[in-house]
Amino acid sequence: MSGPAAATAHDAPSSEGLEHVAGPLRAVAVATLSIACAALVALAAVEVWQVVARYVLDSPAAWTEPVALLLLKIVLMLGAAVGVRQETHFRFALGAAAAGRWQNALETFGRLATAAIGIVFAIWAASLTIATWELKTPGAPLPLGLSFAPFVVGGALIAVFAFERLRAGGRG
């Protein structure tokens, strides 16, 4: 096999090899992806109901928009975290193009930068979650702080999975 397909298949990152480094994190990644998939299905159902209620029943439901936005944040942040574990998200192609010790240094830098971004996400979102928890979400009986919670969880998971990759080094 030659051409772009061969290069893509050869260069595709994988989470294989990480189980011996952090076996429990594989279960966390599977659970995270399962929750993201369930949230995506729920998001689709809420959007369908939003359209049916508005255009078929002529009685729009106020709760659908804030719930859809919350589900979207869950899908995006949890999906991004799993993508970090598989190194298919926040991937730095420059590291793969570099030679020898520069490749390892750039991959290490990329993983550290990703972990730092995850930590900042988690801390910043935690402060927003706490600061806005007592406020109510317009249109839905939910605390406004709940809308920032996916960034707390997703940011923490991004950091954990980036550190897992850092510990694994070039393996996987």
Predicted stretch roles:
Residues 1-172:
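Alpha-helical transmembrane segments and membrane-interface helix-loop junctions
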